[in-house]
Amino acid sequence: MLEKLIERVLFATRWLLAPLCIAMSLVLVVLGYVFMKELWHMLSHLDTISETDLVLSALGLVDLLFMAGLVLMVLLASYESFVSKLDKVDASEITWLKHTDFNALKLKVSLSIVAISAIFLLKRYMSLEDVLSSIPKDTPLSHNPIFWQVVIHLVFVCSALLTAVTNNIAFSQKERH
C-alpha cells in the first residue's frame, strides 16, 4: 500500500514539468519578437544596406529560426515524453513527434546546436577583417577569440558525432536481443 502511494506521488510529479513547458513557450514568443524586430530593421534599411550586412542579417534570422525550432522540438517532445500525450492534436500534424524518443531528441538537439554554431561562425567569417583588425598581430593563438570559437564548434561537432555513434551502437545491440 505504501509502495503504491509512493509510486502514484512520484508519477504525479511529472505534472511539475507542465508549467515549465508553458514558460518555455514564452521563449518562442520572445524569439518571434526578436525575429520580427530584426526583419523589420533589415527591410527598413533595404536601400542602404550593404551586401555583407544583408547576408549577416539573413544569417541572424536563420539562427533565430533554428533556435525557435530547437525550443519547439524540445518543448513538445518533453511534454509528450514526460507529462502527457498530445491527444487533442491532429496526429498527422505531429507525426515526427511520434518517432522522437529521448535518444532521437538528443541527436536532433546536438545537430541543431552544431547548425547554430556553424551559423555563428559563418557570421564571424563574414566580418573576419573587423575581428582580425581588433587583435594585435603578436597575440598568441590561445588569446584569439576566433580560435576558441572554432574549437568550441569542433567540440559540438564531435559531441554530435559521438551521440550518433552511441545511439547507433545502442540501437543495433537492442535489435540483436
UniProtKB/Swiss-Prot annotation:
Keyword set, alphabetical order = Cell membrane, Membrane, Transmembrane, Transmembrane helix
Transmembrane as UniProt keyword: yes
Pfam family name, one: UPF0114
- Membrane association type: Multi-pass membrane protein
Where do transmembrane segments lie in this chain?
15-35, 54-74, 145-165
GO cellular-component terms in the record?
plasma membrane
The cellular location(s) given in this protein's UniProt record come to: Cell membrane
Keyword check for Nucleus, yes or no: no
Similarity remark: Belongs to the UPF0114 family.
Q: Which NCBIfam families match?
A: HI0507
Q: What is this protein called?
A: UPF0114 protein jhp_0175
